[in-house]
Amino acid sequence: PTNTFDTYDSVGEREDLSDVIYSISPTDTPFISSAAKTRATAVLHEWQTDALAAASTSNAVIEGDEATLDAVSPTTRLSNSSQIMDKTVVITGTQEAVDKAGRASELAYQIAKKAKELKRDMEATITGNQAEVTGSASAARKLGSLGAWVATNDDLGASGSSGGAGNTARTDGTQRVFTEAALKSVIKSVWNAGGDPSMIMVGPFNKQKLSGFTGNSTRFDAGADATLYTSVDVYASDFGQLQVVPNRFSRDRDAYVLDMNYWGIAFLRDFTMHELSKTGDSEKRQLLVEATLESRNEGASGLVADLTTS
C-alpha cells in the first residue's frame, strides 16, 4: 500500500554480521608432531652417529692363537644450523578499542592466527628440499631440511641426484607415476640398512595413488556396514606395518618412508612471543622459533622422489 514503511526505507537497522569467524585453513603438522623434541645450545647443533661392522661368516679363531686386534671405527659427527622463523603483528590502539564482530581483542586474535601460520611455515620448511646455510651478518641461517638429508635409500627420477649431510639439496629429476614397486623397493632398502620404518608421508595426490595399490593394506579399522572405504591408512609391507600419513605442507612430489625414532627437532628457542618497542599508538608483537632438524641416522628412512602431482 501507499506510504508503507519497509526495511528498504529504514535507516537505523543494525547490520547482521555473525559473531563467529570461520576458517578452514589446515593447521595439522604431522612431521613436527611425530618427531622427537630435543634441546640445542648453539646456533650450530651437532650430534654423532655410528654403525656396526658388516656381519661376517668367517669369524673363526684357531685354538690358542694370539688375538688379532680389530680396527676401531670412529663415530661420525654431523651438524645442522638453527633457523629463526618469525611472524609479527602490529595493531593500532583504535582498532583494539572499537567494537568488533567475532573477537573481543584484535591483538589476541591476530597473535593466535600468526602462531598457527608460524607452525605451518616450520612444517613446510623442515619437510622441504632446502640445503643448510650457515649464514652471516647479512644472510639468514637456514636449516638443512628432510630432502637434503635422505640419500642412502632414495629412488629418484631420471636425471635426479641425491642430497647429502643436510648441506646439499637434492636435485629434482623427471617426474613419474608413483608405483607400488618403487615403494616396496625403498621399504626393503631401509630395512636392509637397519631401519624399522613406521610412517609413509605423502602429499594429497600421491596419498590417493597409494590408496590404489593392490598389495596388502588396511583400508579401515572399524565402521558401519554401509560405509565404502577407498583409502589406505595402514600399509602392510613385508617388513612391518606403516601408517600412511598425508601432509598438506610437504612436497607432493616426494613420498617419504620414515623411521621417526631417527628424526628430531632441536629447539634453541622454543615458540615464544615478545613485545616490540612502542613507537606510536599501536601494539607490536613478534612470535618466533629458532630450531633445526636433527637427522639421527638418515639411513633409517627412505624416499621415492620425483612423482607426478596431477
Where are these regions (language model features)?
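Flexible, glycine/threonine- and acidic-rich loop/arm segments that mediate assembly and lattice contacts
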Residues: P1-S310
